[in-house]
A protein has these predicted regions:
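Alpha-helical tetratricopeptide repeat
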Residues: 1-607
Length: 607
């Protein structure tokens, strides 16, 4: 057999799928004719079929070496290089093939694939269309490729912020392939970004009609429902997406956002955990989980999340702000200030950043520094109610009560339902002696927020100062309904009850206060005083002993205990306590009271 016979044998074996036999025959042909370019070419094609691309390339190299104008050898070598991921060299080979044979339609198609792999969609589309113009027979097979190229170019344009160009490309993709579910879904995403929610929903619905298992379409429709505040439908779609694809990190993340919005914080954290398990570098998931943890007062956990986010991307200005707030909640004010500094270095015109730093400065007593920050925030945004409110707090701390009133008034004008601003303005008015104005502000604060405990407490204190004891008791009672574990509230209500001579009621409240916090000497003293007025002298004595144990230099307590001892007939102990009180008055320089107590002691000694 000659070389031609072996070549024909190889060709026939190839047609029958007998690839190894074909390779053997072509090899025999090459041995008989070492310059048999077609034999190298065909042996290279079989190597490509068998995915032995390196051997294929070696065969095509030899064929081209023998015949530099062998267009299909360049074409097939290009395809082998494409499958090895060497797209640039593949394109170079297609260029050579087309220079030799401009009508080689397959080479345009394959070069288009290489451009597609390099995300050069413009050139890919041009090559695909050129393929159809040369060979209408390839049109049916290539329409999907053209649609894919337009679709991917649309995705790339969207990533660059060219939403209109992206929509045009998705529409073009759908003209080439009307059943392209992903193109509908991605066009729906753009409609959603542009606020066209109904168009977005229609596109996602169409995508799911075409492909009921397209997890991305459920996810994207869920995002549209979320934007429309239809949270139940959003969660249902995320659930469906995750049923189809349990490893869909974005679906966990976005479901977490919805659950967080619905205040289902533990479930939200679980979803963010899953998202991060699947995508450990998702900075946004760390941020959102940190925000939820802050809401749950897990500030250390929140800080750990913010740390990780900033480790991935140190230029996230807002995350420094989030971490600053968490640090401030933990009392780490200096670190909070440092984070606010970093935020403001990255974004010097973020008014809220100055407010956050001001809050930390207030916490360390730097009220003047805080005011400077609030001033700067208001230069940037003169409608920032939080800045007026915070500056009002700082001014009150510096005893600039008129300034505090002005700032809270500005905050209220910007936010008429800002209950805390009414409360703080009431505080400043009370400190200026305008008790009735203060009460009016507390009334308004409670009208807006009936659970604002500070307003009840401060209104009660103001009413107590005005000797409106019954009203004060009512307000303290309201405060205690909100927080029944406040010793101070019981103590102050007891004082009001004492003032209206309800000594039994006062004793009950002092007892509650002592049960919550037994360290407060005044409660022991005041309960002892109440017992004394009820002539329950033994109980009074026990309480006064406790008071003096906690505060051993308390003149009034010694005088009261002396009186109790006298009522119990223990003159010796009464005289001893009066002597102690006289000694304390003398040390204080209060000679008048000292002399009065000495006279009283002399009278007792004569009895």
């Amino acid at each position: 057999m000659n070389a031609e016979d072996f070549f024909n044998q190889g060709f026939n074996n190839n047609l029958q799928g007998k690839y190894q036999a074909a390779i053997t025959a072509y090899t025999q042909a090459i041995k008989l004719n070492p310059d048999y370019a077609e034999a190298y070419h065909n042996r290279g094609i079989i190597s490509s079929i068998l995915t032995d691309y390196h051997s294929a390339i070696a065969n095509f190299n030899r064929a081209i070496e023998i015949n530099p104008n062998f267009a299909t050898a360049y074409y097939h070598r290009a395809n082998a290089r494409y499958f090895l991921g060497d797209y640039e060299k593949a394109i170079a080979d297609h260029n050579q093939a087309l220079a030799i044979d401009p009508n080689l339609a397959q080479s345009y198609h394959s070069r288009g694939n290489a451009y597609f792999a390099l995300a050069d969609y413009d050139k890919a589309i041009a090559d695909y269309i050129q393929t159809i113009e040369i060979s209408t027979q390839l049109a049916d097979n290539i329409n999907n490729d053209i649609a894919n190229a337009y679709h991917n170019r649309g995705v790339a344009r969207l990533d660059r912020g060219d939403s209109q160009g992206a929509i045009a490309d998705f529409q073009e993709a759908l003209q080439w392939y009307p059943h392209f579910a992903a193109a509908y879904s991605n066009r729906g995403n753009i409609h959603q970004m542009l606020g066209n929610y109904h168009e977005a929903m229609a596109d996602h619905d169409r995508a799911l009609e075409l492909d009921p298992n397209l997890a991305e379409a459920y996810h994207n429709r869920g995002n549209a429902y979320y934007a429309l505040a239809d949270y139940e439908s959003a969660i249902a779609d995320y659930n469906h997406a995750l049923k189809i694809n349990p490893n869909f990190a974005d679906a966990y993340y976005n479901r977490g956002l919805v659950l967080s919005h619905l205040q289902n914080y533990q479930a939200a954290i679980e979803d963010f955990n899953q998202a991060l398990k699947l995508n450990p570098d998702d900075v946004q998931a760390y941020c959102e989980r940190g925000l939820v943890r802050s809401t749950l007062e897990d500030y250390e956990g929140a800080i750990a999340d913010y740390d990780r986010a900033l480790q991935e991307n140190p230029t996230l200005a807002l995350v420094y702000g989030f971490r600053a707030n968490a640090l401030r909640r933990l009392g780490n004010y200096q670190s909070a200030i440092e984070d606010s500094n970093r935020l403001l270095q990255l974004n010097p015109n973020l008014a809220e950043g100055y407010c956050d730093r001001a809050a930390a400065r207030r916490s360390i007593g730097d009220h003047k520094g805080a005011i400077k920050d609030y001033d700067r925030a208001l230069q940037i945004n003169h409608n920032l109610a939080a800045a007026y409110y915070g500056r009002g707090i700082a001014r009150e701390a510096l005893q600039d009560f008129p300034g505090a009133i002005d700032d809270n008034t500005q905050a209220i004008e910007l936010m008429p339902d800002f209950s805390q601003a009414y409360c703080n303005r009431g505080n400043a008015r009370r400190l200026l002696g305008d008790e009735h104005g203060a009460i009016a502000d507390y009334d308004k604060a409670l009208e807006i927020n009936p659970d604002l405990i500070e307003a009840y407490y401060n209104r009660a204190s103001t009413r107590y100062a005005l000797e409106e004891y019954e009203n004060a008791i009512a307000d303290y009672t309201q405060a205690l309904q909100i927080n029944p574990q406040s010793a101070a509230f019981y103590s102050d209500r007891a004082n009001a009850r004492y003032a209206i001579e309800d000594y039994h009621g006062a004793i009950k409240d002092y007892t509650q206060a002592i049960a919550i916090d037994p360290s407060f000497a005044e409660d022991w003293y005041n309960r002892g005083r109440s017992y004394s007025l009820l002539q329950e002298f033994n109980s009074a004595l026990a309480d006064l002993n406790e008071a003096l144990q906690r505060q051993p230099h308390w003149t009034s307590a010694y005088i009261l205990r002396a009186d109790v001892y006298r009522n119990l007939g223990n003159l010796q102990q009464a005289i001893a306590d009066f002597q102690k009180s006289a000694q304390l008055y003398y040390q204080e320089g209060n000679i008048q009271y000292y002399q009065q107590i000495i006279q009283l002691i002399e009278q007792l000694q004569q009895e």
